[in-house]
Amino acid sequence: MILNYQLYILESYIGQSKTAAAVTISIMSVVTMVVALIGSLTSGAISDKLGRRKIPVNIASLLLAIGYLLPWVMKTSFSMILFAGFAGLGYAVYGAVDQALNVDVLPNKEEAGKDLGILNIATTLGQTAGPIVTSALVGMAGYNLVFPVAIAFAVLACIFIQMIRSVK
């Protein structure tokens, strides 16, 4: 919900000029790249070693929620850079471990392609709905409402992950 609107958040919510927002987004991109590399390369292996999927996915959701919280409570460009770090790491961990979780919950390994295709549709629909929901929220109440809703979605992700009974 936040990623697609970074420029607008920096300009309209934080109050930066186009030039300052461009600099902040450049810094955010570097921060995100670094933490995403670290998170992607380490989280899957750690999850395998622990034999657990839910804990890393819940940690990832918590990191995302912290990332969303920071610009909501601190309207500064620095809070957006912190957002990039926390949310970038959270998204990387979530992406790596969630893929392993998806494979673990497949009902029939012989139909993995079909089942993963269905999971991909669900993921794509969520990514498509995010900007639509964000646009509606901004239209209703500005960016102040976007952050708590994003936090709520991260918390809901934790709750739904806990409902999966077939994996630890």
Regions from the language model: what does each represent?
Residues 4-23:
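Short amphipathic helix-loop junctions that connect adjacent transmembrane helices
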Residues 110-139:
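A late C-terminal transmembrane helix in Major Facilitator Superfamily
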Residues 62-75:
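C-terminal ends and interior cores of transmembrane alpha-helices
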Residues 93-107:
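Intracellular juxtamembrane helix-capping segments at the cytosolic ends
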Residues 79-94:
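Hydrophobic core of transmembrane alpha-helices in multi-pass small-molecule transporters
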